[in-house]
Amino acid sequence: KVKATSVSDIKEICKAIKEANFPYKFIVLDTITALEEMVKPMALQMYINTPAGSKFTGKNILDAPMGAGYSKVREAMEAVIDLVSKCAPNVILVCHTKDSAVGDSDVNVKSIDLAGKTGRILSSKSDAIGFLYRDDDSNTVLSFNTNDKFVECGARPSHLRNKDVILGEMQ
């Protein structure tokens, strides 16, 4: 377990993994919410380096006019995730969830808790999305079932598609 508190930490970790000849099959980024905060300085610099952002004097990228900061945060997150994904064949992203309304209906679903469109875009690029919860028997379950409650869950690999995996049983 290695703790990173900045994008430069992540770059150093990736460099060390490359120098060690890629020893890991899996890398876990825990959490993506923390990564979203980490990339904000990078996103701010990316925005300032554009013609539209060259006169921006704010310190918070999300204060950029016309929502431009959100797309830069998304670009920065994608760049960091792409960097990490070159370090191992499998990257697991741990995300927090939020309750989201579906259109104008009274239906609420769980979705990835990231700003703007980032959660939806991240979902579309993922091979599998599971929702971790405790069932009625207090078992720890990772669900890849797409249903009316966990709409962003699902999996492209057939061995995970529409499956509930019990990770721990209550004794």
Where do the model's predicted regions map?
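Conserved acidic residues
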Residues: K25, P89-N90, D127
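P-loop NTPase motor core
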Residues: I32-I121
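Basic, amphipathic N-terminal segments that precede the first structured/catalytic domain
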Residues: K1-F26, K163, G168-Q171
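Conserved, well-folded catalytic cores of nucleic-acid-processing
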Residues: A16-A20, M38, V94, K125, ...
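Structured loop/turn residues at beta-strand edges in well-structured enzyme cores
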Residues: F22, C87, S124
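Conserved GTP-binding G-domain of TRAFAC-class P-loop NTPases and closely related GTPase folds
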Residues: L83, K98-Q171
